[in-house]
Amino acid sequence: MTEKPVTYQSLDMLDNILRQQTLASVSRYRSLKSTLGENEKKSVFIDDIMSSSKDIYGQDKQKLKVSETSKYFQCENCGRSIAGGRFAQHMTKCLERRRK
């Protein structure tokens, strides 16, 4: 069996797989916890992750929400400046009406 060198692409792929599995595990835990209630044993590690105000990258969730909605984007179709929080809604209506 020949061994291939480790590349950035393979490391990135491994990182993505691990991140997806971690998020899936946390999601399963949350759904089980909400279904079973608080009667089960508590996992300190996962409870810390759930109660944290930071996302998986260590960034504050509230700051991300505010910074994303305060950004303005230019609509390619009609040329208007649209707030980030309303961009998807605008694009749906804008493309339906075919504004120019």
UniProtKB/Swiss-Prot annotation:
A zinc finger (SGF11-type) spans 73-94. Pfam families: Sgf11. It is found in: Nucleus. InterPro entries: SAGA_su_Sgf11. Its main location: nucleus. Signal peptide: none annotated. One of its GO terms (cellular component) is DUBm complex. GO terms for biological process: chromatin organization. The keyword Nuclease does not apply. Gene3D superfamilies: Classic Zinc Finger (3.30.160.60). Keywords: Activator, Chromatin regulator, Metal-binding, Nucleus, Transcription, Transcription regulation, Zinc, Zinc-finger. The keyword Metal-binding applies. Coiled coil: none annotated. GO terms for molecular function: transcription coactivator activity; zinc ion binding. HAMAP family: Sgf11. The long N-terminal helix forms part of the 'assembly lobe' of the SAGA deubiquitination module. Component of the 1.8 MDa SAGA transcription coactivator-HAT complex. SAGA is built of 5 distinct domains with specialized functions. Within the SAGA complex, SUS1, SGF11, SGF73 and UBP8 form an additional subcomplex of SAGA called the DUB module (deubiquitination module). Interacts directly with SGF73, SUS1 and UBP8. Belongs to the SGF11 family. Functions as a component of the transcription regulatory histone acetylation (HAT) complex SAGA. At the promoters, SAGA is required for recruitment of the basal transcription machinery. It influences RNA polymerase II transcriptional activity through different activities such as TBP interaction and promoter selectivity, interaction with transcription activators, and chromatin modification through histone acetylation and deubiquitination. SAGA acetylates nucleosomal histone H3 to some extent (to form H3K9ac, H3K14ac, H3K18ac and H3K23ac). This is SAGA-associated factor 11. The lineage of its organism: Eukaryota, Fungi, Dikarya, Ascomycota, Saccharomycotina. The gene is SGF11.
